[in-house]
Amino acid sequence: MKIDFDQIPLKHLPNFNGGEKEFAAHMLIDENSKILLGRLIPGASIGYHRHENSYEVIYFLSGCGKALYNADETGIENAVEERIAAGDCHYCPEGHFHSLINNGDDDLVFFAVVPLKK
């Protein structure tokens, strides 16, 4: 099935998961998964959160920033900081924590998939 993100309404999510500014995305959500084309403007972030019953795969299309990643509950201060840029892929396994931060000068644009457990 082809997904035309231009035909999916853009959702504006301020302070998503406790992040800064706004996360905007075209999201296709069905009973199996959440598939999205997302954008963080410079200075915006998706807050540090846990993937309790799912995992997430993110492929970066343009821009640069950083991902904070932690495999346990020791907190954001112990998270590993990973530089991300167009062409990189970030994986957050089930039960792990992560955050995305656009600390670059351009929009950080990415494609993400989060399978939903039944």
Protein language model features and the residues they cover:
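A short, N-terminal "cap"/entry segment at the start of jelly-roll beta-barrel domains
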Residues: 1-34, 47, 81-85
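Short beta-strand His + acidic residue motifs that chelate non-heme Fe in jelly-roll/DSBH
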Residues: 47-49, 67-68, 92, 98-104
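Short acidic-glycine-tyrosine-enriched beta hairpin
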Residues: 72-94
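Glycine- and acidic-residue-biased ligand/ion/polar-headgroup-sensing regions
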Residues: 53-66, 70-72
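Ligand-binding loop in jelly-roll beta-barrel domains
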Residues: 85-86, 94-118
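Conserved hydrophobic/aromatic beta-strand scaffold that supports enzyme active sites
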Residues: 27, 35-39, 57, 81, ...
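Conserved short histidine dyad/triad with adjacent acidic residue
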Residues: 36-53
